């Protein structure tokens, strides 16, 4: 056997996690804002963590075998992560998606060989989540040995982030953390990471960033275009009492946040990252200078070239929000 250095992994899956953290000096010069670059996971997003954790847990406990057919409703990133891992482990996968998935994400999922079921009808809230869930239930009833990942209700979702990025953040940041800011959709990442962070930094304030029009925190549903943030249902794994503050951001603000991040820091990240940047800009107007803020950048920008990085899309969102051109 050829001797390998510690830097050489046996599998691509071994490279999930241990993502770098950078301080956003240029964008937030009066505060210490540290961003964990979750888009540097091999599948391009933080969703690699729950995908790997849930599948490996299922295999370990006999819930997933070589004959299992994985099923999940996804807006893109988890679908990519599951497709990557399913390909490596030789498992069948069907992703239930909707028309708001970015064209790039859809192509990546298909390139990995996963089956794709596209729903077309929006649900009662104007989104597609409940329609996707109904399709999942239909597939579970018709496919033998099907296993539903069920990210909105699966406790393994938040546990993957608790043991993963949450632990890595605590190991990296030695000074007191004043605020942890994270986007929400399934709420697995904010629940898992914040629980780990609070163990070492009990005074940290947990700030959720949600999309305007999302119903997670009780707001009325309105039409949303940006995938990967917000939801048209309340996730079962959410514990609202653990969230100190919620900041809602619209699609236009999110796009501007993405563009500011690349202009000031050279970081090319996805739509929900723009939401985070916009939320932190709001947060710092009401907190002390020099506060330590920790956040995550969930996915890569190249998956949003037709969305937040499209001038045509930006103008459409600007018009929708009633913003006047200068």
From Swiss-Prot:
Quaternary data: Homodimer.
PANTHER family linked: CYSTATHIONINE BETA-SYNTHASE
GO biological process, one term: cysteine biosynthetic process from serine
UniProt cross-references to Pfam families, sorted A to Z: PALP (PF00291)
Catalysed reactions listed for this entry: O-phospho-L-serine + L-glutamate = N-[(2S)-2-amino-2-carboxyethyl]-L-glutamate + phosphate + H(+)
Enzyme class: transferase
Residue ranges crossing the lipid bilayer per the database entry: none
Regions annotated as coiled coil: none
InterPro entries: Cys_Synth/Cystath_Beta-Synth, P-phosphate_BS, SbnA, TrpB-like_PALP, TrpB-like_PALP_sf
Gene3D superfamilies: 3.40.50.1100
Organism: Staphylococcus aureus (strain N315)
Positions contributing to pyridoxal 5'-phosphate binding: 77, 185-189, 272
Cystines in this chain: none
Protein's recorded name: N-(2-amino-2-carboxyethyl)-L-glutamate synthase
């Amino acid at each position: 056997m050829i001797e390998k250095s510690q830097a050489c992994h046996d599998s691509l899956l071994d490279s999930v996690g241990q993502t770098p953290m950078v301080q956003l000096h240029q964008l937030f010069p009066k505060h210490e804002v540290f961003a964990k670059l979750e888009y540097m996971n091999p599948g391009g997003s933080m969703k690699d963590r729950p995908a790997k954790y849930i599948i490996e847990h299922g295999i370990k406990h006999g819930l997933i075998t070589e004959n299992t057919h994985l099923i999940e409703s996804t807006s893109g990133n988890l679908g990519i992560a599951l497709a990557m891992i399913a390909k490596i482990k030789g498992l069948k996968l069907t992703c239930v998606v909707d028309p708001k998935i970015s064209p790039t994400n859809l192509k990546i999922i298909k390139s990995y060989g996963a089956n794709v079921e596209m729903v077309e009808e929006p649900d009662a809230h104007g989104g597609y989540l409940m329609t996707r869930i109904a399709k999942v239930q239909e597939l579970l009833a018709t496919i033998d040995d099907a296993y539903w990942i069920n990210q909105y209700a699966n406790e393994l979702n938040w546990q993957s982030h608790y043991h993963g990025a949450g632990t890595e953040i605590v190991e990296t940041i030695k000074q007191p953390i004043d605020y942890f800011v994270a986007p929400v959709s399934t709420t697995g990442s904010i629940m898992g990471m914040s629980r780990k962070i609070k163990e070492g930094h009990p005074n940290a304030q947990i700030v959720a960033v949600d999309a305007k029009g999302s119903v997670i925190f009780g707001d009325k549903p309105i039409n949303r275009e940006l995938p990967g943030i917000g939801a048209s249902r309340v996730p079962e794994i959410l514990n609202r009492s653990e969230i100190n503050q919620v900041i809602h951001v619209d699609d236009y603000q999110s796009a501007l946040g993405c563009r500011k991040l690349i202009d000031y820091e050279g970081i090319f990240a996805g739509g929900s990252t723009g939401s985070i940047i916009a939320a932190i800009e709001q947060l710092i107007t009401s907190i002390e200078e020099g506060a330590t803020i920790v956040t995550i950048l969930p996915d890569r920008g190249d998956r949003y070239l037709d969305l937040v990085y499209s001038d045509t899309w930006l103008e459409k969102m600007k018009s929708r929000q009633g913003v006047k051109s200068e």
